[in-house]
Amino acid sequence: MDREDFQWKNKEHILELEQFQGKKGQGLPLLYFPLLLAHTGVKNCFTTREGGCSTGMFRSLNLSFTRGDNPQAVTENYRRVAEAMGGTLSDIVCSDQTHTTNVRRVDRSCGGYGVTKERPYTDVDGLVTDEPGLILATFYADCVPLYFVDPIHHAIGLSHSGWRGTVGRMGQHTIEVMRREFHSDPGEILAAVGPSICKDCYEVSEDVASAFAKEFSGHECEILIEKGGGKYQLDLWKSNEIVLKDAGILPEHLAVTNLCTCCNPNLLFSHRASHGKRGNLGAFLKLV
């Protein structure tokens, strides 16, 4: 796999692709944001479908234990990503996503949650930490990953934002938790809106469109296109960009994806493109 295999929405190099070679000889392609590497003490990635050992509709790097895949295969997939991130399974801390705006601070005692150990929490769509070595993990198949790096206070955050999280301003909630827990200044945070469904692929009903029109009053023309018959095209990328800028993220500190999961169903899992027959992609973020 190389970068040219993807269908990009434009030619900007917002995301790059690297090939990690595991100790067992397996190759693992991972997407990453160069902007977040401006702070050299951070590793970030977003997985593709390739480089794992799952089969069938889960081919091949599925990261979901709850959709019917072989648990041993899923665990091995996690191990490969952890290795690429310079860690082990016991370094990963997973969210428990239920489309909330709940954000939890995690520490070394949380290592392995969601992979090698049961999580003692539920309904957590965002994670933050200031502990080096922990690998934050959230999961996707069209929803929006949000990455946060505070290079001044050496803290990171990773959040899942579907349409409910976006209209609930999940990005703002994550920044507020980082401000409270680590004294982060939004003007110093580097942020990224990760691969997810684009506006051309994301048709929503009138009730969802109305919720966005109310929350993003004044920005309706930027995020919604009326298609008729009570249907609209919704731009989650622009919506999250607005949320993050409203929360104080500077334009030069923000990267917004140009890669759609639904446009690339052979390389990325997409719930909409597969009609629900799919695995999960993962966003990962680590302080070194």
State what each model feature region is.
Residues 1-288:
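Active-site microenvironment for binding and transforming phosphate-containing groups
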